[in-house]
Amino acid sequence: MAEVGEIIEGCRLPVLRRNQDNEDEWPLAEILSVKDISGRKLFYVHYIDFNKRLDEWVTHERLDLKKIQFPKKEAKTPTKNGLPGSRPGSPEREVPASAQASGKTLPIPVQITLRFNLPKEREAIPGGEPDQPLSSSSCLQPNHRSTKRKVEVVSPATPVPSETAPASVFPQNGAARRAVAAQPGRKRKSNCLGTDEDSQDSSDGIPSAPRMTGSLVSDRSHDDIVTRMKNIECIELGRHRLKPWYFSPYPQELTTLPVLYLCEFCLKYGRSLKCLQRHLTKCDLRHPPGNEIYRKGTISFFEIDGRKNKSYSQNLCLLAKCFLDHKTLYYDTDPFLFYVMTEYDCKGFHIVGYFSKEKESTEDYNVACILTLPPYQRRGYGKLLIEFSYELSKVEGKTGTPEKPLSDLGLLSYRSYWSQTILEILMGLKSESGERPQITINEISEITSIKKEDVISTLQYLNLINYYKGQYILTLSEDIVDGHERAMLKRLLRIDSKCLHFTPKDWSKRGKW
């Protein structure tokens, strides 16, 4: 068995922790750092295959020294493009690299879409030609069993979901059914390349390079051991004390403090409670700077220009970085607008969360970063932020999508919002003149301001799309309908467009913003 003094950075061994059920478990963890406080060693551990927000300092009593794995000495590897080659490349990038090295030419798909493996009984149905309309006596029964969704490359000759083809609605067994027409009489390909998760981030399955602009941008570099470790112990913000999840580039001298004190109105940071109290006697703000563009009840939204209110915007980014791992901080906030959601009481407007967006986005992004502060999570505020971002897009007359990559919690929130919003549209369709109502993907996108790609990926994620006799059929089972109705009953916070006072600006005509 190894001794405590032999433990170094890079070692792996089981570490005792409590799980969600308050039970002891021994997951494998990596030692990222070692420090000595008053003669007692502390070890900063990252639990393998766990989110980094669970990383923590532990004592040697929680380490299983019998199963320690010492780091292997790595052979020196040549650098690629002038960058150190100590960290293995991501699988997505290694595949094309290996293919090029072998001299093979990779096929470039013209289009990528999602397909479903349908049961054989659905594919071969007696009676009727492919061009005939589907009737309620067809085989479109509610599909109660779980089927795996698959991604496949589609050649130009293979039909893909049409964005303008109308969707028909007809009832069966008390549940609504939608049928989206497409090119008839073509067979589907069956080769599978991945899962529907890929459709959220990019159309070709290969992550794009991060944009090096803006206040918070994609972070793909985790080589620096310093940025892999939480550096702030605790933050006091108003009546809340927050435990940061990730590294944030606050000044080095603040990282040794037991508590970092923030003014909840201007977000300036101080070393002590005395500093905060002195600041509060001088701070005139009782709400975020900028214009209040929405108020309903106790909820307000403030629009803040990253150029006009640079200090506040930078402090907001520093605070947000404590809870966002997939982004890295930049101090150029000029190209961004910040929308801060607050909750009002007799003391002022308290920050709940925020999202930022580019003043000019060539990729139709309506959100760059989005965050609900931990004390307000799981209360419906996340969806309210998302709904507000799309409400702004509606006023601007645009469709929008969040900047990728999304965090794990962000992806869950967006999928939930997209699903509820699209199902709300589909279930609200009414028939006219006795005919089945029809709708296209383009129309759904225009009504909701959700980008067409997100509409399609959501329908695929919900497993609503089936291909039958040359048509793409949207099938809403009773389980889907019941689940949606239950979810909407719990969603009490909604954006009221009548309470929004917002005039979009044409930033392209304003020079340097």
Swiss-Prot record:
Effect caused by changing residue 148 to R: In K6R; abolished autoacetylation
Cross-link Glycyl lysine isopeptide (Lys-Gly) (interchain with G-Cter in SUMO2), where in sequence: 430
Catalytic center residues: 403
Comp. bias (Polar residues): 133-144
Consequence the record notes for mutating residue 451 to R: Abrogates sumoylation
Outcome, altering residue 327 to R: Decreased autoacetylation; leading to decreased acetyltransferase activity and ability to acetylate FOXP3
PROSITE patterns: MYST_HAT
Entry keywords, A to Z: Acetylation, Activator, Acyltransferase, Centromere, Chromatin regulator, Chromosome, Cytoplasm, Cytoskeleton, Disease variant, DNA damage, DNA repair, Growth regulation, Host-virus interaction, Immunity, Innate immunity, Intellectual disability, Isopeptide bond, Kinetochore, Metal-binding, Nucleus, Phosphoprotein, Transcription, Transcription regulation, Transferase, Ubl conjugation, Zinc, Zinc-finger
Protein's recorded name: Histone acetyltransferase KAT5
Lineage, uppermost ranks: Eukaryota, Metazoa, Chordata, Craniata, Vertebrata
Gene that this sequence comes from: KAT5
